[in-house]
């Protein structure tokens, strides 16, 4: 069922949540060398997906032990199974495809990693997402410690596909952009419920769109392309609240 949340209703529903800790970490950690080596071997066809998973499992098991050892009250898998903090989750949504890009929206100094982006190809939905199994493994090895799962915010999908991309052309279903915002929100409703049903009680939505919308240079560039960031930002608030 679709839940219609207006700003007033959201404010009425806000509750004060007291987490069982006074400090927290983002949740992404540097990959150990042996995991980076395994990823390279997988990319080159030297090992298969099951062999890579076994290495990931080992690295995550070791990381969780360290997190608990230093006193973290909520542990993560370090995002060790991901190539990117955001694209992996979004690309595994129904109706979304990862494609090559000429460059990232943020230019790195020194080494330039291969760029990628996303394209909306069909109705966006959430079904049988691999991140659910990722969480279940983490929850199992944590043995009762609170587990935090991190996923990109709903706004990141729209930002990447529709705002950053100068070549964006909506598919027939999304010529009315309200339908796009709605489908993204409903997909996230399903995702949040699925993680909850899997035992997740700490789901963090990571979002860099707001910082980008505050950047003077970015705002100028988007305005020159005819984009109204203030209007888009309001739509993001409504979409996240609906999600």
Identify the role of each PLM range.
Residues 9-243:
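Domain-level signal for soluble alpha/beta catalytic cores
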């Amino acid at each position: 069922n679709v839940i219609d949340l207006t700003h007033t209703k959201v404010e009425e529903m806000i509750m004060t949540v007291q987490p069982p800790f006074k400090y927290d970490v983002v949740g992404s950690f540097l990959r150990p060398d042996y995991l980076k080596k395994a990823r390279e071997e997988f990319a080159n066809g030297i090992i298969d997906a099951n062999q890579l998973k076994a290495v990931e499992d080992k690295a995550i098991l070791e990381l969780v032990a360290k997190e608990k050892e230093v006193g973290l009250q909520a542990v993560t898998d370090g995002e060790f199974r991901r190539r990117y903090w955001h694209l992996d989750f979004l690309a595994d949504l129904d109706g979304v495809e990862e494609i090559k890009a000429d460059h990232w929206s943020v230019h790195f100094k020194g080494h330039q990693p291969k760029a990628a982006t996303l394209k909306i190809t069909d109705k966006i939905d959430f079904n049988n997402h691999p991140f659910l199994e990722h969480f279940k493994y983490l929850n199992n090895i944590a043995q009762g410690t609170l587990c935090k799962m991190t996923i990109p915010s709903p706004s990141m999908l729209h930002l990447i596909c529709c705002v950053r991309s100068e070549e964006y052309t909506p598919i027939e279903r999304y010529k009315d952009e309200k339908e796009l915002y709605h489908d993204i929100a409903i997909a996230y409703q399903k995702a949040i419920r699925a993680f909850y049903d899997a035992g997740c009680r700490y789901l963090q939505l990571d979002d860099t769109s707001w910082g980008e919308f505050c950047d003077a240079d970015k705002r100028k560039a988007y305005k020159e392309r005819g984009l109204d960031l203030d209007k888009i930002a309001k739509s993001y608030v409504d979409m996240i609240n609906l999600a």
